């Protein structure tokens, strides 16, 4: 009898430990509140296919997936910003935004502020467009993988060193 109790307790721990739903119940409740408010469980929502899920499936590498996720999170932050005056769903949006903030930006308020600044940059403003084009070379250089540059410099130095010793 005692042995059976230990096995059942162990199985319960494994099930609860592997289930993310157990510790995230309030988060899911808030999503359910938003689904009810927007009538998002209605079958017509599926018309035209999913908005983000198919795109997420296409990206397997973690670094690539982060790029897509940043665009999706940006969309949700814009959506919540547009609905900020709606008191009926404000609490739900705040809880979900906080959870996104923790998961995507690792709780860094500096990252959140920078992320919000980027979201709010108007692309139809001529001055903004001119600044963006002016900064494009530096942005492109920043996008280049730095590890390859280091490897290239290292191999060039090794090659030069061999040539100099002959």
Curated annotation (Swiss-Prot):
Record-level GO BP terms: adaptive immune response; defense response to virus; humoral immune response
Record bears the keyword Glycoprotein: yes
Single GO MF annotation: cytokine activity
Disulfide bonds: none
Residues with the Pyrrolidone carboxylic acid modification: 24
Expressed in which tissues: Released primarily from activated T lymphocytes.
Localization in the cell: Secreted
Pfam (any one): IFN-gamma
Residues carrying sugar: 39, 106
GO cellular component: extracellular space
Keywords: Antiviral defense, Cytokine, Glycoprotein, Growth regulation, Pyrrolidone carboxylic acid, Secreted, Signal
Record PANTHER family: INTERFERON GAMMA
Assembly behavior: Homodimer. Interacts with IFNGR1 (via extracellular domain); this interaction promotes IFNGR1 dimerization.
Protein name: Interferon gamma
Source organism (scientific name): Camelus bactrianus
Source taxonomy: Eukaryota, Metazoa, Chordata, Craniata, Vertebrata
